[in-house]
UniProtKB/Swiss-Prot annotation:
Residues 1-49 are annotated as: Disordered. Component of the mitochondrial inner membrane i-AAA protease complex required for mitochondrial inner membrane protein turnover. Residues 90-124 are mitochondrial matrix. Component of the mitochondrial inner membrane i-AAA protease complex. It is found in: Mitochondrion inner membrane. This is Mitochondrial inner membrane i-AAA protease complex subunit MGR1. Keywords: Membrane, Mitochondrion, Mitochondrion inner membrane, Transmembrane, Transmembrane helix. Residues 9-20 have a biased composition (Basic and acidic residues). Residues 1-72, 142-368 are mitochondrial intermembrane. Belongs to the MGR1 family. The chain crosses the membrane at residues 73-89, 125-141. GO terms for cellular component: mitochondrial inner membrane.
Length: 368
């Protein structure tokens, strides 16, 4: 985007100075106004905006907490916090050891046992144990959060990191694009994870007509990952159901194999004669509605934003934020703004050209 700034004109500057002097002579200047009329506003950024606010569950590092999509850094900080917690446990054990008064010296009476006392006070031992327990428990909570199959904070951090790259910024590899957004609060994170767990429970239920198990059975009826026969529902939560139905990795592997077989079958049978040479006749048949590849029951969505379902407003908002059509349009659009100055000399030049044009026409007529 280019902006043309006209050069200053000496005549305009002189007129402006005359107007300023006339206005100053007519109107007295108030004594309280010490700044000039063309003062520049200085923007002072908020210092709090430069402090990272990455979310965490059990880490104690505060602003040093890495971004949620920086998994190696998160694992490193979790391990460091766990090691520090173990160090407090070791320190408490050292303080709780018993030692004899005056050290291990030879007692005058061998039958008398030496008097033992603790190395440190009880309050130091209790404080070390509490601190070590808090650090170890916090690192365990953070590890559970990082190992979840679905983490809203991870998706949020990754989304805004991509947005920062699109805008031409280079986000920090450790802290992420923390200047672009404020992370969601813990309550919103809990609600999103709870909704995800409920959806997973619905997908793995065999009684649900639109479940994930029926989809896999349609793609491969001979699959041994999900049992086709009805089984008595055993007591237990989602982990027990996942264990009975099969792991997601096994289901994905089986679906991938079934899709590969279907593609090979289509390429060798129905789409065997589909080449670039007969592309024009095939397109004509498709436009005329006479092709065998047309599904009359297929209803095309009015808005297509990738291979994602948009059954409700939340899913539509998620897809819209992921694809960012307005941001892509802004990046693909180029702006060129030109400012043409207007001054008194331009009108005089135009009048001179109009006056000279009849003379040139007469000269050309005489020459012909």
């Amino acid at each position: 985007m280019g902006v043309y700034i006209p050069p200053p004109n000496d005549k305009d500057d002189g007129d402006k100075k005359k107007q300023d002097t006339n206005s100053n002579t007519n109107q007295p200047t108030p004594p309280s106004s010490s700044s000039p009329s063309g003062s520049t506003t200085i923007y002072i950024p908020n210092p709090a905006s430069s402090i990272p606010r990455n979310p965490k569950v059990g880490l104690i590092w505060g602003p040093l907490t890495p971004a949620s999509d920086n998994l190696p850094a998160l694992y490193s900080m979790i391990g460091l916090q766990f090691v520090i917690g173990c160090g407090f446990f070791k320190y408490a054990r050292t303080l709780s050891r018993l030692r004899p008064i005056g050290g291990f010296q030879q007692q005058p009476h061998a039958h008398m046992a030496p008097k033992l006392v603790r190395t440190g006070p009880i309050w130091k031992i209790a404080l070390s144990v509490i601190t070590g327990s808090a650090l170890s428990f916090g690192s365990g909570l953070e590890l559970c959060r990082v190992t979840l199959p679905y983490d809203p904070w991870y998706d949020e951090a990754q989304h805004y990191r991509r947005m920062a790259v699109k805008n031409g910024d280079k986000p920090s590899s450790w802290f992420g694009a923390y200047r672009y957004y404020k992370p969601m609060d813990f309550k919103t994170w809990i609600d999103k994870v709870g909704d995800w767990i409920e959806n997973v429970e619905k997908e793995i239920k065999i009684d649900d007509p639109a479940n994930f198990a029926n989809l896999s059975l349609e793609l491969g009826k001979n699959s041994n990952v999900i049992n086709v026969q009805r089984q008595p529902q055993t007591s237990g939560g989602i982990l027990n159901k996942l264990n009975n139905k099969g792991k997601y990795l096994e289901i994905y592997t089986k679906l991938n194999e079934n899709n590969t077989k279907r593609w090979e079958k289509l390429l060798h049978e129905d789409l065997n004669e589909v080449t670039e040479l007969n592309k024009a006749p095939r397109l004509d048949l498709i436009l005329e509605g006479k092709s065998d590849l047309i599904n009359p029951e297929f209803t095309k969505s009015a808005i297509i934003l990738g291979n994602h379902t948009m059954d409700d407003d939340d899913q539509f908002e998620m897809v819209w934020l992921n694809f960012e059509p307005w941001d892509e349009l802004k990046l693909d659009t180029e702006y060129d703004i030109r400012l043409v100055p207007s001054y008194a000399g331009a009108t005089e030049e135009i009048e001179n050209e109009d006056q000279e044009s009849p003379l040139t026409d007469n000269v050309v007529a005489k020459q012909t």
